[in-house]
Amino acid sequence: MLDVDNLDLENLLKKYYEKTNEKIVFVNKDGKVIAMNDAAEEIISKDNNYSAMTNAICNRCEGYSNEFALQSCINCYLDTTKPNDMNFQVFMKTVDNKIQPFTASYQCIDDEAQIYAFTLQDISPQIERQEKMYQRQMLRKTIAAQENERKRISRELHDSVVQEMLNVDVELRLLKYQQDMAQLIEKSEHIELLMSNLINDIRDLSVELRPSSLDDLGLEAAFKSYFKQLEYNYGLNVVYQSNIQTIRFDSEIETVVYRVVQEAIFNALKYAGVYEVEVTIQQTEEGLIAEIIDRGKGFDPNLKPQGTGLGLYGMNERAELVKGTVNIETHIGKGTIITLEVPV
């Protein structure tokens, strides 16, 4: 350890206090701000007529991060007369009304006099770098997912639509050589069946990409059609309850709700190992709530998700487009509950 006498140490600390970019605020036992450095003026102007830390800080605070939310005021770090020493991430509004993230600490520095230090370090550059890295990572995954989807559609077209069309083409070519009327009728009926299968394949693919019933009739009709298709194609029974009936919502909201429910069911079908899913759509005073329940395998939310992880990520991203939220409750062996809430 460096040998620094008390005078030099006091001088160094004073210089640090005056020149650091770290915002430092000292508070007494009554919560009153007794001193702060110049850097703290970016958050609290000395022209403010504040008398207590909670008034001065709370007016500029946009919430702190906890295990439940990115920005929350629940169980505020300043809400107790004898706070524990703690470190956390907080969002503060600067004097020019820009919201910035900070690493904050709130610590008792003098037990006898009960003096506390509230410090803030701007972490905007780190957050921006992390976001850019995350965006690049998600862009790569999105591009990969798009390519996989294109491959899937290509296979669907080749294996079903193109094959059916080739069969029809062959049957039509043979038809002109038929002399017997009975065989002619039989071949014609077979071509009819092939054409019917072809139409169904194209319709299924079209519905999967974008159901016309969603635009024309709304969520209720689109869901009922989609659930019938799921039962026919995959043997999945969807127990459906709703109070929206023929109510129409904003087009963007309907699209988000439909896609989130679709993705949740797809995940259950692919990973949960179930043959039945419960879907409930309710309009309440708070907004539109969609709940998707499967009683399958469940998963550990702390582990890397199966597949690309874009399904869960996409649900959250879609919900945010309409100021909605997605909550996922899951336990291994007990299934998964996905709840989407959208203000309307």
UniProtKB/Swiss-Prot annotation:
Task: Please list the GO terms describing molecular function.
Answer: 4 iron, 4 sulfur cluster binding; ATP binding; iron ion binding; phosphorelay sensor kinase activity; protein dimerization activity
Concerning InterPro entries, the annotation shows: HATPase_C_sf (IPR036890), His_kinase_dom (IPR005467), Sensor_HK_TwoCompSys (IPR050482), Sig_transdc_His_kin-like_C (IPR004358), Sig_transdc_His_kin_sub3_dim/P (IPR011712), Sig_transdc_His_kinase_NreB (IPR017203)
Where, subcellularly, is it found? Cytoplasm
Give a short account of its post-translational modification.
Autophosphorylated.
* EC number(s) reported in the record: 2.7.13.3
Cofactor binding notes: Binds 1 [4Fe-4S] cluster.
Please state what the protein is called: Oxygen sensor histidine kinase NreB
Origin organism is Staphylococcus haemolyticus (strain JCSC1435)
